[in-house]
């Protein structure tokens, strides 16, 4: 087992839902049952300085198109009850429910030139927004955009001087000089590229301006 991706989000009762992927590289030597434990879901409770945790679920299909192989990044969308799971061996994003059921939806099949890596979600209100999926490359990354609600492909953008990206993160909260939030990408395991979300709104207003 090799813990890799993690996503943490608050629930309605003030606890934390934590989803962790198991990216085991020795795929051919795994018994089939191991694929059923590719994702772990914990509940964390924080009380003062104390943290308690409970394992809620372990899951992953063991047969069929929803079977999870080399899983890396993971990201939850509670409003739509979806988990986006990057499967590097199959070069796709597989969509599960937060309860651990495969939805039958596979995104970006045939679209990744490199490896599917970091995932981020740009929200427009409770239901709308844009998914960002990293297409890792040693030359130049590509970032594929999908509609949050319909899961339809929208378009792809690149970032100059940013390569070999694994993790990404996006916040829409104003932070200092980043008035609309910030988009961060790991750059070739050396540093972090930082982009003002305002740049997205200027370059792709039809996607990132929530007011239309």
Whereabouts are the PLM-identified features?
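Sequence/structural signature of beta-propeller domains
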Residues: 1-212
């Amino acid at each position: 087992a090799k813990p890799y991706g993690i996503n943490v989000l608050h629930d309605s009762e003030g606890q934390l839902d934590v989803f962790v992927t198991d990216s085991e590289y020795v795929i051919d030597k795994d018994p089939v049952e191991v694929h059923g434990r590719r994702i772990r879901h914990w509940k964390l409770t924080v009380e003062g300085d104390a943290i308690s945790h409970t394992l809620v679920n372990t899951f992953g299909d063991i047969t069929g198109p929803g079977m999870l192989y080399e899983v890396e990044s993971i990201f939850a969308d509670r409003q739509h009850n979806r988990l986006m799971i990057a499967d590097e061996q199959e070069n796709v994003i597989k969509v599960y429910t937060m309860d651990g059921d495969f939805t039958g939806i596979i995104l970006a099949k045939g679209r990744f030139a490199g490896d599917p890596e970091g995932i981020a979600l740009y929200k427009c209100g409770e239901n709308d927004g844009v998914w960002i999926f990293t297409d890792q490359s040693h030359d130049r990354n590509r970032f594929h955009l999908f509609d949050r609600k319909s899961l339809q492909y929208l378009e792809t953008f690149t970032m100059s001087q940013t390569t070999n990206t694994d993790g990404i993160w996006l916040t829409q909260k104003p932070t200092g000089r980043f008035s609309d939030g910030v988009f961060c990408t790991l750059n070739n395991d050396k540093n972090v590229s930082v982009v003002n979300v305002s740049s997205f709104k200027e370059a792709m207003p039809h996607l990132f301006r929530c007011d239309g």
